[in-house]
Amino acid sequence: MTLWVLGLNHQTAPMELRERASFVGDALPRALDSLRNLPNVNEAALLSTCNRTELYAETTNAQMLLNWLEQHRPGLQNHLYQYRDAAAVRHLFRVATGLDSMVLGESQILGQVKDSWSMARTHGTLGNTLDRLFQHSFSVAKHARTNTRIGTNPVSIASTAVRLAQDAFSPLNESTVLLIGAGETIQLAAKHLSEGRVQRLLIANRTHAKAQMLASQHGGYALPLTELNLHLAEADIIFSATAAPTPIVTQSNVESALHIRKRKPILLFDLAIPRDIETEVGTLTDAYLYTIDDLERAVEENRHSRREAAETAEAIIELQVKRYMDTLQAQAHQAPLRRLRTFGTTTRDELLTRARRQLANGRPAEEVLEQLAHGLTNRLLHPPTAALREAALANNTELVRAAEQLFPEKPGYHHPTLQTTIVKTDETDPAS
């Protein structure tokens, strides 16, 4: 089996394609159920965020994964990257650490990777390989963030958006802010806004209890999502990040809000994929709409300031990739060693039981011991001897050289066991 990663992100695909590629809401568990039924796919996990959609799988057939992706999210082939084995391990480590993020070093992605791992476990698509890989990525991310400055003054898309809002509406203590959603992105935005002492904070969410909890934490007011349009006109700044499959803030609703506000400007941040706010809102006079792709330009300064820390983190990841692959290789070699030991102990126990039975029946001990010795020799060495003969006939020099390393011939010395075995296997039934 081979480890594969297929995906696209903000570097390979524009927002319109990332929107089409995403698995949000019920689409994610349905996709995992579908992957579980694919032949030759042992394990799978899906990571779907506003900036990336990635499929992690252990399979012998990468083309099957491409076909599955084309069936469920058509038209992405020219924007996909593919990583295999060590490259796949390296990619996940970089993603979890924040080195592959739009905001270099942002911490939110680690929580999203953990959510992906948890969802795959819940739906039975995670086995030992991916489980071990994902958990190791958590450790690598923690190590990199602890031992470099990549995590200093944590930055996220949410914090970048709040900083832009502060620049546009300074001070925030004279502004009303409306948050739509209650997920991690909105939670981060609420935290940064409360630190900026926003005058009034409104939180609308489909699950009202979650909105109430978030509002109580940050001194805000909770609204049912069904009343959203009634409060749009109150907001100077709007942040939206839900998992809705279609936009929930429309051009007509914002136009109505601007009319009520007597054309007082509204600043809107759409932090969702798929988008929460209709693109046409950005064409309205006095409505200023920023999307995730717009924020990429704003975070470029952060990327440069963290470059040195990122280089150190990259070195840590390279070391961790090597260690992880070395461990996998060692574990792969353990399997034949375990089979060899099992074969040896099973053969020993079987022939020893037969010998004891013969002794109990009064057969001479010398005769029983001799038969036991010959039986062990034949049983244990017949398979490798037969394999070496076939290798010699097929000119498989690699296997022959391996045998020479296992049984080196010293000057003037012939390995008695090997010599005896070859003679005996010619003359004796190996099952005797």
UniProtKB/Swiss-Prot annotation:
Parts forming coiled coils: none
Top EC group: oxidoreductase
Catalytic function, reaction form: (S)-4-amino-5-oxopentanoate + tRNA(Glu) + NADP(+) = L-glutamyl-tRNA(Glu) + NADPH + H(+)
Pathway: Porphyrin-containing compound metabolism; protoporphyrin-IX biosynthesis; 5-aminolevulinate from L-glutamyl-tRNA(Glu): step 1/2
Location of the region described as Disordered in the Swiss-Prot/TrEMBL record: 410-432
One protein family per Pfam: GlutR_N
GO BP term (any one): protoporphyrinogen IX biosynthetic process from glutamate
Enzyme Commission (EC) number: 1.2.1.70
Transmembrane segments: none
UniProt KW keywords: NADP, Oxidoreductase, Porphyrin biosynthesis
Residues annotated for substrate binding in this entry: 49-52, 101, 106-108, 112
Residues under site feature: Important for activity: 91
Comment field on protein domains: Possesses an unusual extended V-shaped dimeric structure with each monomer consisting of three distinct domains arranged along a curved 'spinal' alpha-helix. The N-terminal catalytic domain specifically recognizes the glutamate moiety of the substrate. The second domain is the NADPH-binding domain, and the third C-terminal domain is responsible for dimerization.
Task performed by this protein: Catalyzes the NADPH-dependent reduction of glutamyl-tRNA(Glu) to glutamate 1-semialdehyde (GSA).
HAMAP family: Glu_tRNA_reductase (MF_00087)
Subunit structure: Homodimer.
Note: During catalysis, the active site Cys acts as a nucleophile attacking the alpha-carbonyl group of tRNA-bound glutamate with the formation of a thioester intermediate between enzyme and glutamate, and the concomitant release of tRNA(Glu). The thioester intermediate is finally reduced by direct hydride transfer from NADPH, to form the product GSA.
Protein's recorded name: Glutamyl-tRNA reductase
Organism: Xylella fastidiosa (strain Temecula1 / ATCC 700964)
Classification lineage: Bacteria, Pseudomonadati, Pseudomonadota, Gammaproteobacteria, Lysobacterales
